[in-house]
């Protein structure tokens, strides 16, 4: 699990202005190994890219990692803003 976190961090760090704000959280569910990438709100456009191309490329790299068992890897990307309920 730590290898995938390191991979996500390594891929995203050169893209952002605020690398210290990169945070990768992990949660395991019955079907997925879920990784939640949070970046500074000013960097979200750089990580997603035009028409989501950068985000798609990051997901392709992360999804290509082999994991043992039937679970699949899932990556979500969020900015660091709090959501109002």
From Swiss-Prot:
Keywords: Cell shape, Cell wall biogenesis/degradation, Cytoplasm, RNA-binding. One of its GO terms (molecular function) is RNA binding. Disruption phenotype: Cell length is reduced. One of its GO terms (cellular component) is cytoplasm. Disulfide bonds: none annotated. It is found in: Cytoplasm. It holds the Pfam family KH_KhpA-B. GO terms for biological process: cell wall organization; peptidoglycan biosynthetic process; regulation of cell shape. It comes from the Bacteria. Residues 32-85 form the KH domain. InterPro entries: KH_dom-like_a/b, KhpA. Its main location: cytoplasm. Forms a complex with KhpB. Belongs to the KhpA RNA-binding protein family. HAMAP family: KhpA. A probable RNA chaperone. Forms a complex with KhpB which binds to cellular RNA and controls its expression. Plays a role in peptidoglycan (PG) homeostasis and cell length regulation. This is RNA-binding protein KhpA.
